[in-house]
A protein has these predicted regions:
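Condensing-enzyme catalytic core mediating Claisen C-C bond formation in acyl metabolism
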Residues: 1-24, 226-291, 295, 368-369, ...
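Conserved catalytic cysteine-centered active-site region
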Residues: 55-109, 153-157, 223-249, 334-365, ...
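Conserved beta-ketoacyl condensing-enzyme motif
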Residues: 22-89, 93-110, 114-133, 200-216, ...
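Flexible glycine-/small-residue-enriched beta->alpha junction loops
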Residues: 109-164
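Active-site pocket-lining segment
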Residues: 161-163, 199, 207, 277-280, ...
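N-terminal extracellular/periplasmic Venus flytrap/periplasmic-binding protein-like
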Residues: 10-12, 23-32, 40, 175-267, ...
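Short, well-ordered amphipathic alpha-helical segments that serve as non-catalytic structural scaffolds
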Residues: 27-41, 65-69, 94-97, 158-165, ...
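Active-site-proximal alpha-helical scaffold in enzymes
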Residues: 86-116, 166-195, 256-263, 328, ...
Length: 401
């Protein structure tokens, strides 16, 4: 089987809900990143076998968001483009699928990642309107809440799954808020110091009557503090501890990588950034979906015969502070590694609590950020993982080249 390398990794800045990227569709966000990736590696688009796009909220976006990304990027009609939906894991699952296709010899060059415009998620009326009703009200459904943030089996919000982890592991409100403020501080430092500049594709976007250059993450909260976080009311449960301040955001953005085989690497004289060591996934009880990374990470460590302590950096998507702390607690116990070891190496430039969580893109976003940080620090190995609504997790291990 072929080794698989990543030769380019890019993303947009992450927009706030109804913020600067509101008027940019998911396909347009994805196309901008994909187009820049091909330019960066100086490769003709016709050499791309396919583009795989994670996307969770396609309603109202038009037929085939994945194919739209290809066409809007200006690629020839011969390049295949399609979508993948695995809720929060969609962007990483796209990368995993691309990796497995190249490893199996099916493809040589694939661009994979994810794109999401949560701001453009429409309101829906139920299918029964097609049948008609003699009387009574029709409910209007929020596509974004219903299809991305509500558990399909128990009808509970993702925030309640975080509260379930709080109960399981007795995680205090103070621990959650401290984790959240640390994420904010690291993210603000990274944005202000230009730490993300190499990975972000600048976009010209229209905001009101102005055209601005959108080239930085706009979600980090510069006005928050531990004191302010402590005043926030529980968001999902009357006596709970999960708040808007210690949970991830609702956001817009896109992130992609270019995957190539050994043969393509040599044929087109491409420079590798990292090699993919391995990938894996897991499924657990949907009611504690946030713990999905625990099993996924243990699976990929076992599959690749990797010692957890050989990892220099980790990107664990911060759906909720409680969820992140629950994952770290279980991993530290199961793998006999000190909790502080994880905290020192995880999300060194902040995570989704501060940067945001555009659901279809986040799995790819953490891979892109991990790659660039590994190159800056000359880290040998890194891991990215995230939880997935419905009770799943995905994980990927990368090796610096």
């Amino acid at each position: 089987m072929s080794k698989v390398y990543i030769v380019a990794a890019k993303r947009t800045g992450i927009g706030t809900f109804l913020g600067s990227l509101t008027n940019v569709s998911a396909a347009e966000l994805g196309a901008a990143v994909v187009k820049q990736i091909v330019t960066d590696v100086n490769l003709k688009p016709e050499h791309i076998d396919e583009v795989i796009s994670g996307n969770v909220l396609p309603a109202g976006q038009g037929q085939g968001v994945g194919r739209q990304v290809v066409i809007k990027a200006g690629f020839p009609n011969s390049v295949v483009g399609y979508g993948v939906s695995m809720v929060c894991g969609s962007g990483m699952k796209a990368i995993m699928d691309g990796y497995l296709k190249i490893q199996a010899g099916w493809s040589n060059i694939i661009i994979a990642g994810g794109t999401e415009s949560m701001s453009q998620a429409p309101y829906l009326i139920p299918y029964k309107t097609r049948i008609g009703a003699k009387m009574a009200n029709f409910e209007v459904v929020d596509h974004m809440i219903y299809d991305a943030l509500i558990d399909a089996y128990d009808g509970i919000h993702m925030g309640i799954t975080a509260e379930n982890i709080v109960s399981k592991h007795q995680i205090s409100r103070e621990e959650q808020d401290a984790f959240a403020i640390a994420s904010q501080q690291k993210a603000i430092q990274a944005v202000d110091s230009g730490r993300f500049n190499d990975e972000v594709v600048p976009l010209e976007v229209k905001v009101g009557k102005e055209v601005i250059l959108f080239d930085k993450d706009e979600y980090p909260n510069r006005k928050t503090s531990l004191e302010k976080l402590a005043t926030l009311k529980p968001a999902f449960k009357k006596d709970g501890s999960v708040t808007a301040g210690n949970a991830s955001g609702i956001n817009d953005g896109a992130a992609y990588v270019m995957l190539v085989s050994e043969a393509a690497l040599k044929q087109y004289n491409l420079t590798p950034l990292v090699e993919i060591v391995g990938v894996d996934q897991a499924a657990i009880d949907p009611k504690v979906m946030g713990l999905g990374p625990v099993t996924a990470i243990k699976n990929v460590l076992n599959r690749t015969h990797t010692d957890i302590k050989s990892l220099d950096l980790l990107e664990l998507n911060e759906a909720f502070a409680a969820q992140s702390l629950g994952v770290i607690k279980e991993l530290s116990e199961d793998l006999n590694v000190d909790k502080q070891w994880f905290l020192e190496r995880t999300n060194v430039n902040g995570g989704a609590i501060a940067l945001g969580h555009p659901v279809g893109a986040s799995g790819a976003r953490i891979v892109v950020t991990l790659i660039h940080e590994m190159k800056k620090r000359h880290s040998q190995q890194g891991l990215a993982s995230l939880c997935i609504g419905g009770g799943m997790g995905t994980a990927i291990i990368l090796k610096n080249v």
